[in-house]
Amino acid sequence: MSILKVHAREIFDSRGNPTVEVDLFTSKGLFRAAVPSGASTGIYEALELRDNDKTRYMGKGVSKAVEHINKTIAPALVSKKLNVTEQEKIDKLMIEMDGTENKSKFGANAILGVSLAVCKAGAVEKGVPLYRHIADLAGNSEVILPVPAFNVINGGSHAGNKLAMQEFMILPVGAANFREAMRIGAEVYHNLKNVIKEKYGKDATNVGDEGGFAPNILENKEGLELLKTAIGKAGYTDKVVIGMDVAASEFFRSGKYDLDFKSPDDPSRYISPDQLADLYKSFIKDYPVVSIEDPFDQDDWGAWQKFTASAGIQVVGDDLTVANPKRIAKAVNEKSCNCLLLKVNQIGSVTESLQACKLAQANGWGVMVSHRSGETEDTFIADLVVGLCTGQIKTGAPCRSERLAKYNQLLRIEEELGSKAKFAGRNFRNPLAK
């Protein structure tokens, strides 16, 4: 079925910033998609087009991206009469029309909005659930429910506290199914709230952009200690492991790292990549840390390679790879990490997201699907993670509706699959392994 009409508009994300929403019409109805936006963005990401008109929304308006859809992309898609099931053809057409390496003409936010809406329409056109359509596009015969990685303590660029490292996550790998993983996550979260309240006072339980708590602590180890205590109090020590997103590019300073980067600058406290690696190794030794994302700066390739070779855990590339095939290929060759973080808006289309995922999986890497800190109520990534069988997703704490929207959609998918539902569990790094 071909596209009858495409209409884009400015809506608001969970931080009150404008973002792009796209309505796509076929004879089967209306399909709507909204685009997320990140706070700590890698310098190699596809370009998110903002208006930069300081008199409006602090320069963060997206009226230009919206206009590119309504005036240029929409007429082209309608006139070409392409079937909405032809995801790759449609994405390719938009990328060719844009003609730039990083989608800077139309904006990745424009192309992605249309791409997501096309994918939703394609599923209905085929008469299958979205996750099944995505699995078909990726060439997967089965679908898998992921382990959720709940970001329950926020630091870094996501929070106003002194904590340098951005995310402290709990992964309920010992759960029997996704519903139980949600219950464990929620119970640990509520226990954590009480632990923080008792230790630091009620105002320390205010939440950050992704629904996690942001107590004003400086020591990253203290974040891990709080998690360990909460997991124990909830009674899940044997079922929950810990993941971190350090987002080290945010505190990289001339070849070294500043673990107190939110205070006035003082080069005497900077530490070397080796010292930082030793700190991570002490975390791995003392706590059930099984995954660390962006442990070093996006261009500190040597430090990545050294750490991945010796750490023995999942090392996730986000700012390092930005889901870009060239960066992934380099990271594969240099053995810089062993897991890809997949954010659809880093690369800017469904087709390229699928390709990045397949490239990583083909090289024996894990893949973690991810939200952005500026989110909407759109639930596309819930279906994406199931269809791509990556086995792991991070989409915030079990708090704030834009985060729960994704987790609740995963609950619905598990229910719909019934006895056919498979949960990644402890095999979250390679859920398709026989």
Curated annotation (Swiss-Prot):
Region of interest (Required for interaction with PLG), residue spans: 405-434
Organism domain of life: Eukaryota
Enzymatic class: lyase
Catalytic activity annotation: (2R)-2-phosphoglycerate = phosphoenolpyruvate + H2O
Modified residues (Phosphotyrosine): Y44, Y287
Cell location: Cytoplasm; Cell membrane
Crosslink (Glycyl lysine isopeptide (Lys-Gly) (interchain with G-Cter in SUMO2)) position: K202
UniProt similarity note: Belongs to the enolase family.
Protein name: Alpha-enolase
